[in-house]
Amino acid sequence: MARITVQDAVEKVGNIFDLILVAARRARQMQIGGKETLITKNNNDKYTVLALREIEEDLITKK
């Protein structure tokens, strides 16, 4: 199971509500297949975890 803290991601986006919107939008993009993940996918990482990791690594922004 992936353990991830969202505190770093919240600091990158601004607040928890915007983080939820940005991460959900990015997870949907990856799930539908329109956009590939920008980081290396681990074994059983779900799209929401991948989206949060991308936000933490500054690969995805609020805009």
UniProtKB/Swiss-Prot annotation:
Its EC number is 2.7.7.6. SMART domains: RNA_pol_Rpb6. Keywords: DNA-directed RNA polymerase, Nucleotidyltransferase, Transcription, Transferase. It catalyses: RNA(n) + a ribonucleoside 5'-triphosphate = RNA(n+1) + diphosphate. GO terms for cellular component: DNA-directed RNA polymerase complex. Transmembrane segments: none annotated. It comes from the Bacteria. It holds the Pfam family RNA_pol_Rpb6. GO terms for molecular function: DNA binding; DNA-directed RNA polymerase activity. Belongs to the RNA polymerase subunit omega family. This is DNA-directed RNA polymerase subunit omega.
